[in-house]
């Protein structure tokens, strides 16, 4: 949980986003997002997916499974 909290806040600030901007990008209420960053609330799978897309990273990076910030390349359709 600590890994996700730290990475969420660091990436958000690195991108120059406020919690209000994250609300607009993800649909997660600002107060709920704040609690997630403080470790008082967990991200659902769908919320994690939306946050990763908004921050242009992978869910694996947020979870601490990789140190590669770049998202995985999308498959060609």
What do these predicted ranges mean?
Residues 9, 20, 49:
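Residues within the helices of the helix-turn-helix
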Residues 37, 47, 66:
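DNA major-groove recognition helix of helix-turn-helix
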Residues 27, 46-61:
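DNA major-groove recognition helix of helix-turn-helix/homeodomain DNA-binding modules
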Residues 12, 23, 52:
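The alpha-helix within a helix-turn-helix
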Residues 6, 16-17, 43-46:
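Residue-level signal for the short linker/turn that defines the boundary of a DNA-recognition helix
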Residues 1-14:
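A short, Lys/Arg-rich alpha-helix, primarily the initiator
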Residues 14, 53, 63-77:
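Short, charged recognition helix plus adjacent turn
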Residues 16-35:
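Short alpha-helical DNA-recognition segment
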